[in-house]
Amino acid sequence: MTAPAILVLGTADTKADEISFLRECLTAGGAKAAIMDVGVLGEAPLAVDFSRHDVARAAGTTNAAIAALGDENLAMAKTAEGAAALALELCQSGRCDGLIALGGTMATDLALDVTSALPLGLPKVVLSTVAFSPLLPPERL
């Protein structure tokens, strides 16, 4: 049996420890974990398979242009666009058997956009530090 390829999506600049722990758990369980950094401003202090620059490129822009938008919501929406395009490409090419996203309010919102763009039936898990936020309407959850 081939090891499942799990895409781990998170803001590596703020959740590096959590992402590293999740990668270790997945690898120990026999899966291949690929990390996609969906952060905008900070550099990832860990090795990632898909950088924030790769994500921006998948959205047809650059990370610098996203950061220059000057609006967190616009930046996260553009990042979500790139992350969704890249994740979908990985799924369609057989390089993603499931996705686990983790983060706080903004990363959870972004993860919901990404997971909704992926095929029905693909396992998707969102781990969030928030159970409720006025920034995330209940119908999004």
Feature map (PLM): residue ranges:
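Phosphate/nucleotide-donor binding subsite
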Residues: 46-95
